[in-house]
Amino acid sequence: MANVVIVGSQWGDEGKGKIVDLFTEKADYVVRFQGGNNAGHTLVVNGEKHIFHLVPSGILHKGKVCMIGNGVVVDPGVLIREMDRLHEAGIPVTRENLLISRYAHVIMPYHRAMDNARENRKGKTKIGTTGRGIGPCYEDKVARCGVRIHDLSDPKTLGEKIRRNLEEKNFLLERFFGEKPLDAAAMEQEYLAYGERLAPLVDNVSERLQEAVREGRNILFEGAQGTHLDIDHGTYPFVTSSNTVAGNAACGSGIGPTRIDRVLGVVKAYTTRVGGGPFPSELLDETGERMRTRGGEFGATTGRPRRCGWLDMVVVKTAIRLNGLSGLLITKLDVLTGIPKLKIVTSYKCGPRKIEFMPPELEALEACEPVYEEFHGWEEDIGSVRKFTDLPVNTRRYLQALEEMAGVPLMVVSVGPARDETIVLEYPF
């Protein structure tokens, strides 16, 4: 038995979906514990592309139970459309393979409206939110006025919450943002219908996980976004609205922290970032554009082009510290093929000092200059390689340098988008 947390070690989009899909073969349960449909996992299985925003990536495997924990914010319309697409693809979604925490909070139409109205008003100072209502939903959760999944089956409670919340939201939308008000009655009927559709899947995920632990099952916890988008530990304010670090796996699913056995970090072989915020190793040249094109670096949720740059080990080492990582899972190594000279950021120069971990203040980070180590690239196609020793010598040197800088062993090296285009050095289960 092992309970393993998978997190992103950079700014999200590291390729966690493929890794979770790979490890699900030996897991019994796959659990989402934070975030919402602002993140997308892209998987390629048997040449077919699947994009998930809310349903855990393990849904493609028969006999596995996927769970959406209490720490996730759920847009029920998005979830139902995702379930319908899976059904059309021959993967029916039932309580045999998907459970939703009754305590997960629900994204409402006024959350999306507020999200977009605020972002539009900010103009050039906007953060780059996806506009999916994630942040406003978490705000209502903290303000103790949010709608939870179990409320969707209670017409009285749902109606009262919608009407009470719309008093404030409509006032702001009309008077402050100049937007049209939302209709409470129509919203209530829409969400009661969602509740009826989702009711068979709603359960106490915390209790089900405790039963799984007692039975000695393998549980895989699937993080969304990346460490440096964490609301507390990320590059604030250019962050998401939830805790993305491994410590939230327990809180966001209802399992005790002592039940977690291992925490593994996914690291893209280069670095990407979506939206605003500091990015010390960003490339604004042909190499950066090459990474974006070859790596398909466009958001699975928004389609926005991602900013690209060299692998930054200051970013990765900070993630190792924050999450207590015991292994690294390298993705998109094949994207670097054909680049003559590669660079890795080894430290930052901040005035007279050299530092190896990210400074917590945004202003300090923006003032830092990256210090690089240069490596020879490789020309050979590595997509068919399945053993580490069969990789080109320069590829191995790049990975070995990464591992040495991290002080944490490599467990997986992905050499292509497909499930089988992977070198597995160690399984966590």
From Swiss-Prot:
Q: Which residues participate in Mg(2+) binding? A: D13, G40
Q: What is its EC number?
A: 6.3.4.4
Q: Which GO terms describe its molecular function?
A: adenylosuccinate synthase activity; GTP binding; magnesium ion binding
Q: Supply the alphabetized keyword list.
A: Cytoplasm, GTP-binding, Ligase, Magnesium, Metal-binding, Nucleotide-binding, Purine biosynthesis
Q: Which residues bind substrate?
A: A300, T301, T302, G303, R304, P305, R306
In this chain, GTP is annotated as bound at: 12-18, 40-42, 306, 332-334, 414-416
Cofactors, names only: Mg(2+)
The positions flagged as active site in the entry are D13 (proton acceptor), H41 (proton donor)
Q: Name one GO cellular component term.
A: cytoplasm
Q: Where in the cell is it found?
A: Cytoplasm
Positions that bind IMP? D13, E14, G15, K16, N38, A39, G40, H41, T130, R144, Q225, T240, R304
- Cystines in this chain: none
InterPro entries from the entry? Answer: Adenylosuccin_syn_GTP-bd, Adenylosuccin_syn_Lys_AS, Adenylosuccinate_synth_dom1, Adenylosuccinate_synth_dom2, Adenylosuccinate_synth_dom3, Adenylosuccinate_synthetase, P-loop_NTPase
> Which GO terms fall under biological process for this protein?
'de novo' AMP biosynthetic process; IMP metabolic process
Co-factor remark: Binds 1 Mg(2+) ion per subunit.
Catalysed reaction equations from the record: IMP + L-aspartate + GTP = N(6)-(1,2-dicarboxyethyl)-AMP + GDP + phosphate + 2 H(+)
| Pathway of action | Purine metabolism; AMP biosynthesis via de novo pathway; AMP from IMP: step 1/2
Q: Which domain of life is it from?
A: Bacteria
Query: What task does this protein carry out?
Result: Plays an important role in the de novo pathway of purine nucleotide biosynthesis. Catalyzes the first committed step in the biosynthesis of AMP from IMP.
Per UniProt, subunit arrangement is: Homodimer.
Q: What's this protein's family per the entry?
A: Belongs to the adenylosuccinate synthetase family.
Q: What protein name applies here? A: Adenylosuccinate synthetase
Q: Which species does the entry assign this protein to? A: Syntrophobacter fumaroxidans (strain DSM 10017 / MPOB)
Taxonomic lineage is:
Bacteria, Pseudomonadati, Thermodesulfobacteriota, Syntrophobacteria, Syntrophobacterales
